[in-house]
A protein has these predicted regions:
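Conserved N-terminal beta1-alpha1 strand-loop-helix module at the mouth
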Residues: 1-88, 94-96, 103, 110-111, ...
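Glycine-rich beta-strand-to-loop/alpha-helix junction loops that act as flexible
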Residues: 172-177, 195-199
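Short beta->alpha connector loops at strand-helix junctions that form conserved
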Residues: 90-92, 116, 137-140, 197-198
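Acidic, divalent-metal-coordinating active-site segment for phosphoryl/phosphodiester hydrolysis
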Residues: 177-189
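Structural preference for solvent-exposed beta-strand-turn elements
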Residues: 104-106, 168
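Short, electropositive alpha-helical surface patch
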Residues: 84-92, 187-195
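Non-catalytic terminal and connector segments of soluble metabolic enzymes
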Residues: 15-19, 163-167, 172-173, 186
Length: 220
């Protein structure tokens, strides 16, 4: 499966956000990852539809939106209107997951489902064929710059095995504590979409993105 880098703008410098986004695109990052937090599902508060809509007007990158909010079905239409291409919701935050997935698909967006580190991967079994992407959190969601949880590798492997057994080539995205030094491990475990915040935006953005792209070429 094609390996894709999704720089997380939560780690960007918002004073020069447009410039930094262009740097990621110029070096080959096809996605942009947006962590939307409501201060309830997770402790932090980040940004919402206006930021997404503003960025949408300046890039052709895939808008990959991760909703870390309670009862996310309330926001599906608003994020679609703001320009989201992929809308990922948390299994733990949805009262009726099927209804949420149906609403996302009806809007024309791709639907992702995310799980926290403490949620059993097996809990995704009923919706393996319903989602377009699964996002495995490799840190506790809500804050950037945390250390990668090593047990995440087995969780990625288990999910890829579950998908393979059903003949599904569904994307597995991973987020949290991923750097050039450990990205091969998550790819080897079965992930193909890599969210990176600090690893992209700290230091030379061009050099960092190029580093990920060079590793991805090893898997072509």
């Amino acid at each position: 499966m094609k390996k894709i880098l999704a720089p997380s703008i939560l780690s960007a410098d918002f004073k020069v956000l447009g410039e930094q986004i262009r740097m990621t695109a110029d070096k080959g990052a096809k996605y942009l990852h947006f962590d939307v937090m409501d201060g309830m599902f997770v402790p932090s508060i980040s940004f919402g539809m206006p930021v997404l809509k503003s960025i949408r007007g300046g890039t052709s990158q895939v808008m990959d939106v991760h909703l870390m909010v309670m009862d996310p079905i309330r926001y599906v239409d608003a994020f679609h209107e703001a320009g989201a291409d992929i809308l990922t919701v948390h299994l733990e935050a949805c009262q009726d997951m099927q209804a949420v997935l149906d609403k996302i698909h009806a809007s024309g967006m791709k639907a992702g489902v995310s799980v926290k580190p403490g949620t059993a991967i097996e809990s995704l079994s009923p919706i393996l064929e319903q989602a377009d992407m699964f996002l495995i959190m490799c840190v506790e969601p809500g804050f950037g710059g945390q250390a990668f949880i090593p047990e995440s590798l087995d969780r990625i492997k288990n999910l890829r095995t579950m998908l393979d057994e059903k003949g599904l080539k569904t994307d597995i995205e991973v987020d949290g504590g991923i750097y050039l030094t450990n990205v091969r491990e998550v790819i080897d475990a079965g992930a193909n979409i890599i969210v990176a915040g600090s690893a992209v935006f700290n230091g030379s953005i061009s050099k960092n993105v190029t580093g990920f792209m060079e590793i991805f070429k090893e898997y072509e």
